[in-house]
Amino acid sequence: MKVGIIGAMEEEVTLLRDKIENRQTLSRAGCEIYTGQLNGIDVALLKSGIGKVSAAMGTTLLLEHCQPDIVINTGSAGGLASSLKVGDIVVSTEVRYHDADVTAFGYEPGQMAGCPAAFIADLKLIELAESCIKQLDLNAVRGLICSGDAFINGAAPLARIRTTFPSVAAVEMEAAAIGHVCYLFKTPFVVVRAISDVADQESHLSFDEFLVVAAKQSTLMIEAMLTSLAKRG
């Protein structure tokens, strides 16, 4: 089995990259893909860059060049579920765009024309993530993750997202694009991110302060998931 792992930022991939054995690097169009072995599993770790376009382009390169069997999106997210705090884990059941609007043509809010309203995460990967969460004794929420090309920082955008997507657990800037590409390639995926901030008027300050905490927690999760996959053979 080969596992594709995607993080947007240097801080979100550096801890994993440094542990990859027999590491090789592919640089293409602003993306970097690191291949090798981690915790007994063949991996291809993508640093995509921030935002939906970078994430979609990088995921396409990853799937075309490395052909992973599954994809895990790691990194940080802004928590919207009331029980989430910095360092907690959010696991996607589905991902949606919060900034797409073609409702004039009969589509749901967040649904891109010609596409499903949501991109559904793989149930077996969700269960794998949750078994690792239990093993590591972490606090976590399973739910909807919404993506858009904006850092959510303030009452108005937060209220809009919560009103439009009442079940949203977290927001960030890449997961829906990654899920979209995986859907087109028919590649199972899941998003497993750690909370770096609670999306409010001070979230930019929290993000800067706690990104490292979130990166450590999400890395811990990825390593646990890889170890579990290796044991399963």
Curated annotation (Swiss-Prot):
Organism superkingdom: Bacteria
UniProt: substrate binding residues: 78, 152, 173-174
One GO CC term on file: cytosol
Keyword flag Electron transport: no
Pathway noted in the entry: Amino-acid biosynthesis; L-methionine biosynthesis via salvage pathway; S-methyl-5-thio-alpha-D-ribose 1-phosphate from S-methyl-5'-thioadenosine (hydrolase route): step 1/2
One BP term from GO: purine deoxyribonucleoside catabolic process
GO molecular function: adenosylhomocysteine nucleosidase activity; methylthioadenosine nucleosidase activity
Gene3D superfamilies reported for this sequence: Nucleoside phosphorylase domain
InterPro entries: MTA_SAH_Nsdase, Nucleoside_phosphorylase_d, Nucleoside_phosphorylase_sf
EC code: 3.2.2.9
Top class in the EC scheme: hydrolase
Reactions mediated catalytically: S-adenosyl-L-homocysteine + H2O = S-(5-deoxy-D-ribos-5-yl)-L-homocysteine + adenine; S-methyl-5'-thioadenosine + H2O = 5-(methylsulfanyl)-D-ribose + adenine; 5'-deoxyadenosine + H2O = 5-deoxy-D-ribose + adenine
Keywords, sorted A to Z: Amino-acid biosynthesis, Hydrolase, Methionine biosynthesis
Active site: 12, 197
Function: Catalyzes the irreversible cleavage of the glycosidic bond in both 5'-methylthioadenosine (MTA) and S-adenosylhomocysteine (SAH/AdoHcy) to adenine and the corresponding thioribose, 5'-methylthioribose and S-ribosylhomocysteine, respectively. Also cleaves 5'-deoxyadenosine, a toxic by-product of radical S-adenosylmethionine (SAM) enzymes, into 5-deoxyribose and adenine. Thus, is required for in vivo function of the radical SAM enzymes biotin synthase and lipoic acid synthase, that are inhibited by 5'-deoxyadenosine accumulation.
Entries under PANTHER family matching the protein: 5'-METHYLTHIOADENOSINE/S-ADENOSYLHOMOCYSTEINE NUCLEOSIDASE, 5'-METHYLTHIOADENOSINE_S-ADENOSYLHOMOCYSTEINE NUCLEOSIDASE
Assembly, per entry: Homodimer.
Family of this protein: Belongs to the PNP/UDP phosphorylase family. MtnN subfamily.
HAMAP family: Salvage_MtnN
Protein name: 5'-methylthioadenosine/S-adenosylhomocysteine nucleosidase
Gene name tied to this protein: mtnN
